[in-house]
Amino acid sequence: MEDLPPDYQDQDLPSYETITNTASTAVAPPTRSTLGPATLYISGRFIYSTDPQAPPLYEFSHSIGYLHENDRSVKVERVDQVVKTSAGISQVVLRNRHLFDLKHPTAAEFPNFAYHAEAATRRVLCSFGASTFRVGGILRHGKGYRFERAVKGADRKLEAQDALFEVNPSRDKAVGYEWRDAQGELIAREVKDEMASMSLVITAEMSAEMRDALVAAWIIRIWCELSNGDHSAMRLMMVRFKTVNAVGYAP
């Protein structure tokens, strides 16, 4: 069994939902098992949707465009919106939920994965590791990425289990990579917009936990490119202007 922190208690936040708190009661939110298609983009340490009025969806401990080979750990948090009611006045506040720690161990640690994501709570889908493979032939070749569910073995290192995602370069020049799930179904594409920044266009419905894992895997793939000197990944530092609302999050 993999060691994980204790599960969240009742006072912690539900996934992608709001909860109304009063001085005496807390009303449980309705469940939402599936999230629809969406487009996500990176701005500094944050991931946003395309809604210009919305707060960030995820926050990272590092600015994503500046990740490099010497970085060893990146904290991934989801930014949840919570509605609090006090004295009859409702207020929306943001709270961060720690999801994953993205890891890049040194070669001296003899890791099974050069990059992996460790679950920070039992509420995420799983821990998983990343590996690469070559695709294409003599005239056209590239690098693909494979993400596998992982658990800690007897040596405390993550060991590969079932497939989670597979990522391949796209034949479409406007698309960088295509993401498929364990069943081989297309679930997302990485595309370049008019500002040459990279976005993840999620085309399939999925659970909130699956989307959290997909976002974490996306950042691992980008981190791997940046660590290997892929200059095309530096376009991540070219981001669109984002109107910052009163909560104080800035790109």
Stretches with model-predicted labels:
Residues 1-26:
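Short acidic, low-complexity intrinsically disordered linear motifs used
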Residues 20-244, 250:
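Cationic, beta-structured binding surfaces that engage anionic biopolymers and membranes
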